[in-house]
Design a protein with these regions (language model features):
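CE4/NodB-like, metal-dependent polysaccharide N-deacetylase domain
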Residues: 1-20, 48-52
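Beta/alpha (TIM)-barrel catalytic core signal, keyed to glycine-rich beta->alpha loops juxtaposed to Asp/Glu
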Residues: 22-115
């Protein structure tokens, strides 16, 4: 991650936000504890980038309430956004309310052609 963020900052001059995308692993971990550990390690690396001034703030992408709370519980720099599918056909009211209650802004997306 660091190499990509550093390269983006070099090209753009600044990186306002980076989102930890997709909380599940493509290669199945040995256990849920392993998956939790991978997410925590990734978040800590992102927080180090904030500390170093590489990134302005952090967010999540496709995290449900349980997994969002997992990150919030360990975060020194809590997520400011959660990018999730949100459309008239996929209105996630519970997730939206949970994000609002935690001060996390929802960035909605809709796969092309689903509306």
């Amino acid at each position: 991650m660091r190499r990509q963020v550093t390269e983006s900052k070099r090209k753009l001059g600044r990186v306002d936000a980076v989102a930890l995308h997709w909380p599940l692993l493509l290669d199945a971990p040995a256990s849920e504890d392993d998956a939790r550990s991978v997410r925590a390690d990734a978040w800590r690396e992102l927080e180090a980038m904030v500390d170093e001034g590489l990134v302005g703030c952090l967010g999540l992408s496709n995290f449900d309430v349980e997994l969002m709370d997992e990150i919030i519980a360990l975060a020194r720099h809590p997520p400011v956004l959660n990018e999730v599918e949100m459309s008239p056909r996929c209105y996630q009211a519970e997730l939206l309310a949970a994000c609002e209650a935690r001060g996390v802004r929802v960035v909605g997306y809709s796969p092309y052609g689903t509306c």
